[in-house]
């Protein structure tokens, strides 16, 4: 964990890092992210570089050191480039539609599923069978994509359902006829 925690994080152009006693705030034109910092970790930003140090070598401190460093790196990447997850819908009659801040999914159930899009997330539909989830928070983008996928996970026989783009679904063979 200490090797990850000891790395220096370069601050991208146009990104502002503010360090408070128990909080780190990362701002840019895309938005703002905050992260609470435990008391055993110290964060410093100078000359375009963010560094993290730990107070002692207790196992818990070492774990938090690497975790906080990775979270700050994700924040820096999120406010500069953003994060994106792509989902594909496979199945006859399965489709998605966007109306305001609601995503309506028709997934073979007796009713359409309405998913309220959280603040800070942008969903686009290039096709009715393709969903693109974008935002600055890596955690929130992954969570929203996982929630949408959980409405109808891909099944192994025909591959019907919602899957991540470029993710291979392991297929099973159907029943074979008896002799």
Curated annotation (Swiss-Prot):
In Gene Ontology terms, what is a biological process of this protein? cytoplasmic translation
Which InterPro entries does the annotation name?
Answer: Ribosomal_uL6-like, Ribosomal_uL6-like_a/b-dom_sf, Ribosomal_uL6_a/b-dom, Ribosomal_uL6_bac-type, Ribosomal_uL6_CS
Pfam families (UniProt xref): Ribosomal_L6 (PF00347)
Keyword set includes Ribonucleoprotein: yes
Keyword match Phosphoprotein: no
> What keywords are assigned to this protein?
Ribonucleoprotein, Ribosomal protein, RNA-binding, rRNA-binding
**What does the entry list under GO cellular component?**
cytosolic large ribosomal subunit
* GO MF annotation list: rRNA binding; structural constituent of ribosome
What domain of life?
Bacteria
Q: Which family does it belong to?
A: Belongs to the universal ribosomal protein uL6 family.
**Protein name in UniProt:** Large ribosomal subunit protein uL6
Q: What is the lineage of its organism?
A: Bacteria, Bacillati, Mycoplasmatota, Mollicutes, Entomoplasmatales
